[in-house]
Amino acid sequence: MAGKGEGPAIGIDLGTTYSCVGVWQHDRVEIIANDQGNRTTPSYVAFTDSERLIGDAAKNQVAMNPVNTVFDAKRLIGRRFSDASVQSDMKFWPFKVTPGQADKPMIFVNYKGEEKQFAAEEISSMVLIKMREIAEAYLGSSIKNAVVTVPAYFNDSQRQATKDAGVIAGLNVLRIINEPTAAAIAYGLDKKATSVGIKNVLIFDLGGGTFDVSLLTIEEGIFEVKATAGDTHLGGEDFDNRMVNHFVQEFKRKNKKDISGDARALRRLRTACERAKRTLSSTAQTTVEVDSLFEGIDFYSPITRAKFEEMNMDLFRKCMEPVMKCLRDSKMDKSMVHDVVLVGGSTRIPKVQQLLQDFFNGKELCKSINPDEAVAYGAAVQAAILSGEGNEKVQDLLLLDVTPLSLGIETIGGVMTTLIQRNTTIPAKKEQEFTTTVDNQPDVLIQVYEGERARTIDNNILGQFVLSGIPPAPRGIPQFTVCFDIDSNGILNVSAEDKATGKKNKITITNDKGRLSKDDIEKMVQEAEKYKSEDEEHKKKVEAKNGLENYAYNVGNTLRDMGEKLPAADKKKFEDSIEEVIQWLDDNQLAEADEFEHKMKELESVWSTIITKMYQG
């Protein structure tokens, strides 16, 4: 239950490119608009000489400051620097990423004249703080509890790292839930009045950076995930990348100049490509235009929908593979699917819709829920359920989710011995007995892996621990039990117990490689607080500066209007004071708030003597 005085629990869709926040209020979900009036907020954080910007403000200045504007943290979170996907993404990022301790990717930026380094969890935590602040401004109360969503195909380390980001942001993460499952709740509530009996629903969720497909059965408020598949590295940004590459080559052909090393030019081109991609979802042709793209050369090039489709056809077709896998895993024929639901901004692409519709033999796709907001909507419902706030309409909903990847340990010969199969409903617990492989073996190394391959070398290692103190005995005699326990966030605990001695050891699989330690998180929480107070200081400063500027211009205008009523000497004296303040403002852009306030007082006192004189005269 949420504690009193903590405000309602919110649902946050933490996206690769955009994030969205919702809350259950007055018996319905409210998707909350930010201070710009937008219901989704860019997952961008920018660092400048004077301030930190998050959301729209960060994305709006990206062309001016590409190397210090960080986005795509979700493509780094819970991954290793040496991951092939990280290496390929780095080619498209203007900001610097280098390997930190234990192969953890670290982001380097320049902030207030100093080089700073951040983990992906910290950048994501800044976006989470922004989403919380958007909700707090709307609700007028402080918020502590949240449900945060992740791609269904996120692995254990990516989930754990997302949870850590929530902790750094000062949130109590009630639950990590899968994005397609959250979207299914939005669909289920939308269809509740008209739905009778069991429905098999396929959620096709193609976002800015990740892709998930989940197949659920929905009956009487029970949402049971049968299977899930996907690609944690496929989305709208990959379609943008293809377009950017195409136009970089075209620019090279036409102008014999290579812009690939110019971060600002690439960013401006990318923004134009993103806009063109969106336009091509509703028209057959558009133009990509960027004035003075590189060395004063204007870039102007038409692009047709057909050309855009041709550039990305292999990626669009790739989207169909997880659909087939999902049907296979849930042992269902495509004719048994009642509804195919589109989620995520990239499902607006006509070709993606056409391929999906053709796969389902011309079946109408379900477009009744908002693809940008459905995930946050479902997260807000789940937040209301977990904090006991929802009405009877939602309190009887039950979510039965699954684990996306098989989990097991390495046994002799590097074999993967699976304890929990993929698509097992969570929470889940499974025990299995093992024995020693060498005579008088005193301890056993237990290595935990996730993946579907027969050899552990081809799977992903999650962590390892040692069970020691096994009494000397011939091999095959000692018996020890390994227990896998997955909680409702999809996070794994593994324990082992020696039968004879009762000795135990356990590990929460948190990917020791690259996982933030308790101390790291504590330090980051404190830094987040520090950045927050710096942001507030900066805001105060800007308000004081604007206040002084407005005051100087306003009294200047009033002075001109008064014209002849004032003696020339007084008028001149005051005009000089205003001129001096305006000059001072130009020279002291970075002054502190109290300096602006002090100048304001000086100007006010000069003005009040003049006014007094005038009325006495």
Curated annotation (Swiss-Prot):
It comes from the Eukaryota. The keyword Cytoplasm does not apply. PROSITE patterns: HSP70_1 (PS00297), HSP70_2 (PS00329), HSP70_3 (PS01036). GO terms for cellular component: chloroplast envelope; cytosol. GO terms for molecular function: ATP binding; ATP-dependent protein folding chaperone. One of its GO terms (biological process) is response to heat. InterPro entries: ATPase_NBD, Heat_shock_70_CS, HSP70_C_sf, HSP70_peptide-bd_sf, Hsp_70_fam. CDD domains: ASKHA_NBD_HSP70_HSPA1. SUPFAM superfamilies: Actin-like ATPase domain, Heat shock protein 70kD (HSP70), C-terminal subdomain, Heat shock protein 70kD (HSP70), peptide-binding domain. Pfam families: HSP70. Keywords: ATP-binding, Chaperone, Nucleotide-binding, Stress response. This is Heat shock 70 kDa protein 18. It comes from Arabidopsis thaliana (Mouse-ear cress).
